[in-house]
A protein has these predicted regions:
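Beta-propeller folds
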Residues: 1-190
């Protein structure tokens, strides 16, 4: 079946319309073949790609502190440390003068992705503090396939709950009651 293209005024057929059917085995096979072709074409540039990566990495300050974000009674921020793969997430009490000065004496480590990765791969999806500042919800992808597992951490004692949902898209947000968590699930063709 021929379809007129969306962005054009004339009635010319759109030869790529069939690619919109995400459930089609033909589309999935085509995408796999395109990805294999791309990898084959780029394989000759591996040394150049690595050289460029190292050059860019050399220009990055490896030990750094992000700009603190004030929210409620806290400042939330990230620290990067030389040699670590991922930034650590912290909070501290907001100074009485309203400044964004980090008080290291009241600093609390909220999440250390380096410890969670244990030398392997992780991708942190969502990082969401509950409105009452008592819980941290976060999502992790450990496979590289952009499928996320959901976790809730009690910030008072550090206890962790792994939520029994698989194949989540990594997004989440708290309801105002600080107990309800909304999240998205992936469809079968992800």
């Amino acid at each position: 079946m021929q379809h007129a293209p969306i962005a054009r005024v004339d009635n010319a057929a759109d030869p790529y319309r069939w690619l919109e059917n995400r459930d089609s085995a033909e589309v999935l096979d085509y995408l796999k073949a395109e990805n294999a072709y791309l990898e084959q074409q780029l394989s000759e540039q591996l040394a150049l790609r690595e050289s460029l990566f190292q050059e860019i990495k050399a220009r990055i300050r490896e030990t750094d502190l992000s700009l603190p974000s004030p929210w409620g009674p806290y400042l939330y921020y990230q620290r990067t440390t030389a040699g670590d793969e991922y930034p650590r997430h912290y909070r501290c009490r907001k100074p009485a003068d309203g400044s964004l000065t980090v008080d290291e004496a009241s600093e609390q480590l909220l999440l250390d992705p380096n410890a969670l990765a244990e030398g392997g791969f992780i991708s942190l999806g969502a990082f969401s503090i509950s409105p009452d500042h008592q819980r941290l919800a976060y999502s992790l992808d450990t496979s590289g396939e952009e499928t996320y597992q959901l976790f809730v951490k009690e910030l008072a004692d550090g206890s962790l709950i792994e939520l029994p949902f698989e194949d989540c898209d990594g997004s989440m947000t708290w309801a105002n009651d600080s107990l309800t968590l909304f999240f998205g699930e992936l469809d079968d063709t992800h």
